[in-house]
């Protein structure tokens, strides 16, 4: 089935505060140029960080209907009511730890949602690939996909910006207003936080991302 047409679908995120996307226009353009048997359809979204027209320029199709997609990509948890039976989905479902709550009476809305999501996935014969579980099978099971580093970078940037505000100093542009990391580094490097004492805990991706940003902010690491 070498020449079989494979259709990829890109979801419009269910959360109104989510602007990220699993595939950028540049990535879609690359995929379509490399694989002649590939078709990509994208749900329209006003919240996404890229405009619908940016996807149209790549050759992708814009449509609400993803029923023809073989594989559907998202970022965060999907609206359960929109799940299409017999499909393969990839997104951060955060359902890995739900098993420990099976049989328990749960009031936490987030856990209730995840349990309902898994029930619907099973009911509709869906193959769910959670980005969180794409790991190296050796050693400590290193996660290949995660937002930790950038969460740390942006968290540190926003915290320093809040510090400026609380001390009645001129604030920097919000992180959401800056469209690339190089610009973030350029802006923060012009500030002087050398008298600020910061305690940073943890050793994961988020903390390493925060340390990375603080170096550009002229904050000296002492331990």
Annotated model-derived regions:
Residues 2, 7, 78-80, 84-196:
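Glycine/serine-rich phosphate-binding loop and adjoining beta1-alpha1 elements at the start
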Residues 2-120:
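An N-terminal-biased, well-structured beta-alpha scaffold segment characteristic
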Residues 40, 62, 127-129, 221:
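Hydrophobic beta-strand scaffold residues
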């Amino acid at each position: 089935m070498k020449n079989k047409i494979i259709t990829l679908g890109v979801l419009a995120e269910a959360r109104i505060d989510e602007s990220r996307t699993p595939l950028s226009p540049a990535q879609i353009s690359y995929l379509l140029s490399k694989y002649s048997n590939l078709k990509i359809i994208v749900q329209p979204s006003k919240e996404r960080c890229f405009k619908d027209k940016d996807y149209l320029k790549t050759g992708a199709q814009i449509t609400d209907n993803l029923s023809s997609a073989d594989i559907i990509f998202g970022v965060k948890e999907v609206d359960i009511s929109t799940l299409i039976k017999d499909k393969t989905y990839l997104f951060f479902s955060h359902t890995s730890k739900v098993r420990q709550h099976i049989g328990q009476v749960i009031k936490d809305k987030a856990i209730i949602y995840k349990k309902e999501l898994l029930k619907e996935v099973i009911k509709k014969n869906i193959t769910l690939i959670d980005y969180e579980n794409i790991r190296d099978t050796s050693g400590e099971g290193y996660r290949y996909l995660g937002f930790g580093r950038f969460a740390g970078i942006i968290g540190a940037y926003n915290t320093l910006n809040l510090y400026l505000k609380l001390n009645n100093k001129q604030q920097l542009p919000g992180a959401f207003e800056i469209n690339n990391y190089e610009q973030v580094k350029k802006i923060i490097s012009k500030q002087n936080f050398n008298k600020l004492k910061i305690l940073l805990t943890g050793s994961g991706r988020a903390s390493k991302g925060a340390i990375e940003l603080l170096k550009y902010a002229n904050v000296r690491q002492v331990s």
